[in-house]
Amino acid sequence: MNDQDYTQDSGIGAVGWMRSVVIDAHDPVLLAQFWCNVLDVEIVESEADWVQLSPDPGGTFFAFQPSTAPRPESLVARPDIEVTDIDHARDRIIELGGSYVRTIQELKGDHHYVMADPEGNEMCLVQPLPPELARPRWGDQAI
């Protein structure tokens, strides 16, 4: 099935599918390099107005475009990055030039970390979902 067929009528009620997350950046190359290290992916396209990474294991592309617009006071979205060792991942983000923002305590005693990339874009480091809630990873089986 090609992209056009999927977005016209997938049979599952979807309007479309998540192809990429595009982030405005004052320095797109710097942020692309940071996220390459976070997600263990590579830059696959680099133009004056666009830097795109290879897809992560979930199949989503991150891309960065230049922007001189002021940063909004409140973020309306941030990615959740699933990790197996949350404390190691927090430390690694800091080593790569990111920063720790805060810890969020969850209802069942777990926690996750809100982190920021070098330009202040927030992300959450989260622990894996329990098997009954997790969906198959890209490539493991049909989604």
Language-model-detected regions and their locations in the chain:
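Intrinsically disordered, low-complexity acidic/polar segments
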Residues: 32, 73, 88-90, 124, ...
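Vicinal oxygen chelate
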Residues: 2-26, 52-53, 60, 63-64, 68-92, 94-143, ...
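Amphipathic alpha-helical segments
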Residues: 27-42, 89-95
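Short linear motifs in intrinsically disordered
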Residues: 39-45, 82, 101-106
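Intrinsically disordered, low-complexity regions enriched in Ser/Pro/Gly/Gln/His and often acidic
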Residues: 10, 27-28, 43, 131
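Conserved short beta-strand elements that form part of the metal-binding/catalytic scaffold
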Residues: 39-75, 118, 122-129
